[in-house]
Protein backbone atom coordinates (compact mmCIF):
# COMPACT_ATOMS: atom_id res chain seq x y z
CA UNK A 1 0.00 0.00 0.00
CA UNK A 2 2.85 2.38 0.76
CA UNK A 3 4.19 1.89 -2.78
CA UNK A 4 0.98 3.34 -4.18
CA UNK A 5 1.24 6.40 -1.95
CA UNK A 6 4.87 6.94 -2.96
CA UNK A 7 3.98 6.55 -6.63
CA UNK A 8 1.09 9.02 -6.34
CA UNK A 9 3.20 11.54 -4.46
CA UNK A 10 5.99 11.29 -7.03
CA UNK A 11 3.50 12.22 -9.77
CA UNK A 12 2.38 15.21 -7.75
CA UNK A 13 5.97 16.23 -7.13
CA UNK A 14 6.75 15.89 -10.84
CA UNK A 15 3.80 18.05 -11.85
CA UNK A 16 4.75 20.79 -9.40
CA UNK A 17 8.27 20.92 -10.86
CA UNK A 18 6.96 21.71 -14.35
CA UNK A 19 7.01 25.43 -15.09
CA UNK A 20 3.61 27.16 -15.01
CA UNK A 21 4.58 28.79 -18.31
CA UNK A 22 4.81 25.32 -19.85
CA UNK A 23 1.28 24.53 -18.72
CA UNK A 24 0.12 27.91 -20.04
CA UNK A 25 1.75 27.39 -23.42
CA UNK A 26 0.28 23.89 -23.74
CA UNK A 27 -3.18 25.22 -22.84
CA UNK A 28 -2.94 27.97 -25.46
CA UNK A 29 -1.73 25.49 -28.10
CA UNK A 30 -4.54 23.05 -27.27
CA UNK A 31 -7.08 25.86 -27.54
CA UNK A 32 -6.02 26.66 -31.09
CA UNK A 33 -4.99 23.21 -32.28
CA UNK A 34 -7.96 21.17 -31.13
CA UNK A 35 -10.42 23.89 -32.17
CA UNK A 36 -8.97 23.94 -35.67
CA UNK A 37 -9.07 20.13 -35.72
CA UNK A 38 -12.78 20.23 -34.81
CA UNK A 39 -13.46 22.82 -37.49
CA UNK A 40 -11.57 20.84 -40.13
CA UNK A 41 -13.36 17.64 -39.19
CA UNK A 42 -16.74 19.38 -39.40
CA UNK A 43 -15.89 20.95 -42.76
CA UNK A 44 -14.80 17.54 -44.05
CA UNK A 45 -18.03 15.87 -42.94
CA UNK A 46 -20.24 18.65 -44.28
CA UNK A 47 -18.27 19.18 -47.47
CA UNK A 48 -18.21 15.56 -48.53
CA UNK A 49 -21.97 15.22 -48.08
CA UNK A 50 -22.60 18.55 -49.76
CA UNK A 51 -20.56 17.60 -52.82
CA UNK A 52 -22.30 14.23 -53.07
CA UNK A 53 -25.80 15.67 -52.67
CA UNK A 54 -25.08 18.54 -55.07
CA UNK A 55 -24.68 16.04 -57.90
CA UNK A 56 -28.37 15.17 -57.66
CA UNK A 57 -29.60 18.66 -56.69
CA UNK A 58 -27.18 21.43 -57.77
CA UNK A 59 -29.43 24.10 -56.22
CA UNK A 60 -28.29 23.19 -52.69
CA UNK A 61 -24.64 24.12 -53.17
CA UNK A 62 -24.65 27.81 -52.32
CA UNK A 63 -27.43 27.57 -49.77
CA UNK A 64 -25.68 24.89 -47.71
CA UNK A 65 -22.34 26.69 -47.54
CA UNK A 66 -23.68 28.24 -44.32
CA UNK A 67 -22.84 24.92 -42.65
CA UNK A 68 -19.21 25.30 -43.68
CA UNK A 69 -19.22 28.84 -42.28
CA UNK A 70 -20.53 27.54 -38.94
CA UNK A 71 -17.64 25.07 -38.89
CA UNK A 72 -15.14 27.83 -39.62
CA UNK A 73 -16.53 29.82 -36.70
CA UNK A 74 -15.42 27.00 -34.40
CA UNK A 75 -11.78 27.60 -35.37
CA UNK A 76 -12.24 31.33 -34.83
CA UNK A 77 -13.54 30.66 -31.30
CA UNK A 78 -10.32 28.83 -30.51
CA UNK A 79 -8.14 31.60 -31.92
CA UNK A 80 -10.03 34.26 -29.96
CA UNK A 81 -9.67 32.37 -26.68
CA UNK A 82 -5.99 31.70 -27.39
CA UNK A 83 -5.45 35.45 -27.80
CA UNK A 84 -7.31 36.09 -24.54
CA UNK A 85 -5.22 33.45 -22.77
CA UNK A 86 -2.02 34.86 -24.20
CA UNK A 87 -2.84 38.27 -22.75
CA UNK A 88 -3.07 36.60 -19.32
CA UNK A 89 0.63 35.70 -19.40
CA UNK A 90 2.81 37.94 -17.26
CA UNK A 91 6.46 37.85 -16.33
CA UNK A 92 7.22 36.50 -12.88
CA UNK A 93 10.53 36.72 -11.03
CA UNK A 94 12.32 33.38 -10.83
CA UNK A 95 12.04 33.41 -7.03
CA UNK A 96 8.22 33.30 -7.32
CA UNK A 97 8.05 30.94 -10.32
CA UNK A 98 6.87 27.94 -8.32
CA UNK A 99 4.71 29.75 -5.77
CA UNK A 100 1.15 28.56 -5.35
CA UNK A 101 -0.19 31.64 -7.13
CA UNK A 102 2.03 31.04 -10.17
CA UNK A 103 1.08 27.38 -10.33
CA UNK A 104 -2.61 28.26 -10.05
CA UNK A 105 -2.32 30.79 -12.89
CA UNK A 106 -0.55 28.27 -15.11
CA UNK A 107 -3.07 25.54 -14.33
CA UNK A 108 -5.99 27.94 -14.92
CA UNK A 109 -4.72 28.87 -18.38
CA UNK A 110 -4.05 25.19 -19.12
CA UNK A 111 -7.58 24.20 -18.02
CA UNK A 112 -9.11 27.03 -20.07
CA UNK A 113 -7.30 25.88 -23.18
CA UNK A 114 -8.37 22.27 -22.69
CA UNK A 115 -11.99 23.21 -22.04
CA UNK A 116 -12.22 25.47 -25.08
CA UNK A 117 -10.31 23.11 -27.35
CA UNK A 118 -12.35 20.02 -26.61
CA UNK A 119 -15.67 21.89 -26.49
CA UNK A 120 -14.88 23.21 -29.96
CA UNK A 121 -13.84 19.75 -31.14
CA UNK A 122 -17.24 18.40 -30.13
CA UNK A 123 -18.93 21.49 -31.56
CA UNK A 124 -17.16 21.04 -34.90
CA UNK A 125 -18.22 17.41 -35.08
CA UNK A 126 -21.79 18.29 -34.12
CA UNK A 127 -22.07 21.11 -36.65
CA UNK A 128 -20.46 18.93 -39.32
CA UNK A 129 -22.86 16.04 -38.78
CA UNK A 130 -25.88 18.32 -38.68
CA UNK A 131 -24.60 20.20 -41.76
CA UNK A 132 -24.25 16.89 -43.56
CA UNK A 133 -27.81 15.98 -42.62
CA UNK A 134 -28.95 19.42 -43.73
CA UNK A 135 -27.36 19.02 -47.17
CA UNK A 136 -28.75 15.54 -47.70
CA UNK A 137 -32.26 16.40 -46.52
CA UNK A 138 -32.30 19.66 -48.48
CA UNK A 139 -31.49 17.71 -51.63
CA UNK A 140 -34.61 15.59 -51.03
CA UNK A 141 -37.00 18.19 -49.59
CA UNK A 142 -36.14 21.90 -49.67
CA UNK A 143 -38.64 22.79 -46.91
CA UNK A 144 -36.43 21.05 -44.34
CA UNK A 145 -33.48 23.43 -44.78
CA UNK A 146 -34.57 26.13 -42.32
CA UNK A 147 -35.70 23.59 -39.73
CA UNK A 148 -32.37 21.79 -39.72
CA UNK A 149 -30.50 25.09 -39.81
CA UNK A 150 -32.08 25.98 -36.45
CA UNK A 151 -30.78 22.69 -35.04
CA UNK A 152 -27.35 23.53 -36.42
CA UNK A 153 -27.40 26.87 -34.60
CA UNK A 154 -28.09 25.02 -31.35
CA UNK A 155 -25.17 22.72 -32.14
CA UNK A 156 -22.84 25.68 -32.61
CA UNK A 157 -23.89 26.95 -29.19
CA UNK A 158 -21.76 24.13 -27.71
CA UNK A 159 -18.66 25.98 -28.86
CA UNK A 160 -19.90 29.23 -27.38
CA UNK A 161 -20.51 27.51 -24.05
CA UNK A 162 -16.92 26.29 -24.11
CA UNK A 163 -15.69 29.81 -24.87
CA UNK A 164 -17.70 31.25 -21.98
CA UNK A 165 -16.43 28.63 -19.53
CA UNK A 166 -12.87 29.14 -20.79
CA UNK A 167 -13.06 32.89 -20.26
CA UNK A 168 -14.47 32.39 -16.76
CA UNK A 169 -11.67 29.92 -15.99
CA UNK A 170 -9.01 32.28 -17.32
CA UNK A 171 -10.16 34.93 -14.85
CA UNK A 172 -8.54 32.72 -12.18
CA UNK A 173 -5.13 33.26 -13.80
CA UNK A 174 -3.53 35.91 -11.61
CA UNK A 175 0.25 35.85 -11.48
CA UNK A 176 2.14 37.04 -8.38
CA UNK A 177 3.21 40.67 -8.35
CA UNK A 178 6.85 41.61 -8.43
UniProtKB/Swiss-Prot annotation:
Listed Pfam families: ATP-synt_C (PF00137)
Main location: endoplasmic reticulum
Membrane topology: Multi-pass membrane protein
Transmembrane segments: 25-45, 65-85, 109-129, 148-168
Gene Ontology, cellular component aspect: endoplasmic reticulum membrane; Golgi membrane; proton-transporting V-type ATPase, V0 domain; vacuole
PANTHER family tied to this protein: V-TYPE PROTON ATPASE PROTEOLIPID SUBUNIT
Subunit organization: V-ATPase is a heteromultimeric enzyme composed of a peripheral catalytic V1 complex (components A to H) attached to an integral membrane V0 proton pore complex (components: a, c, c'', d and e). The proteolipid components c and c'' are present as a hexameric ring that forms the proton-conducting pore. Interacts with APD2.
Function (record text): Proton-conducting pore forming subunit of the membrane integral V0 complex of vacuolar ATPase. V-ATPase is responsible for acidifying a variety of intracellular compartments in eukaryotic cells.
Name of the protein described by the UniProt record: V-type proton ATPase subunit c''2
Phylogenetic classification of the source organism: Eukaryota, Viridiplantae, Streptophyta, Embryophyta, Tracheophyta
Gene symbol of the encoding locus: VHA-c''2
Amino acid sequence: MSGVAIHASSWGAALVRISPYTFSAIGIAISIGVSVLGAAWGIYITGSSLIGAAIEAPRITSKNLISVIFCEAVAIYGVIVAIILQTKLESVPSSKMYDAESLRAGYAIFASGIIVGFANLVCGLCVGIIGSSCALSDAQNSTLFVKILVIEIFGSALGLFGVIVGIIMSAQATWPTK
